[in-house]
């Protein structure tokens, strides 16, 4: 069901993009409105078609489509402004070799790919992780490592002080670290639940509390929250993950609002990313079933990292659905209940 809906909506999107292209529509309307009748006859080969254009209201239809197409472009512009603290233009002056980023969970998977993409632009990166520092990153002179349990407020605060003393104040914070747990609600232990909540959600408060104040002071910064498509749809045996990623989205939305209205720092940007299935340790052992169900190959960590870092380098905030073809899933909670359940049931069969 989910695959069918995705295919239909993607087809409609492609057709709609072409049919509602304002430039093409305006050119077509201009031709029909101002073109001489003999030119219409020349191109169509029929005087009947020239008369039919007026009789059957083709010009009126084109005018309606032009209006709709312009409206869609206006909607896209407003989305861009809203995600960028109501500015259409890139924010601030960023010199990448002078910028410092903090990446939680940066030793593997998406986090590691993000670190490599950042250093490719000259950004100095502080990695916070409980995993060991991988040799591939250790040999890069602009990557620094702190072993850190980000679910501990005191640990994050102490390491934030160390980062500031060692390399300076970070202007980029990427809250990437996450944990998955394949167990049902009844099988989840209180200890594991606390660990998952600490890493996937509560840590967002700790890292932002540590690094946001200087961003506000400078009116410059970018905070990226790595959520998931699970923010929009719950999965069996991953209810904890879905609930916490929904919480991460709520955190991002509230953070962006506080930055604008409480701290009056429009130069501090926020981005939230919602990747679909990615080939990482979290999906190990399920790749074949997921790809069979979705009809697509799973994304690689580098695919997600490219989208996220491109957004950072654009100096604009955003909500990123990765890949864009699954954007429709973000609207599932507005669907009729029966359709929501059919979609959840179809996804559940892959797990």
Segments the model singles out, each with a brief description of its role:
Residues 80-125:
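Canonical Rossmann dinucleotide-binding motif of NAD(H)/NADP(H)-dependent dehydrogenases/reductases
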Residues 184-185, 189-194:
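Substrate-binding pocket helix/loop in short-chain dehydrogenase/reductase
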Residues 188, 234-242:
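Active-site loop-to-helix junction immediately N-terminal to the catalytic Tyr of the SDR YXXXK motif
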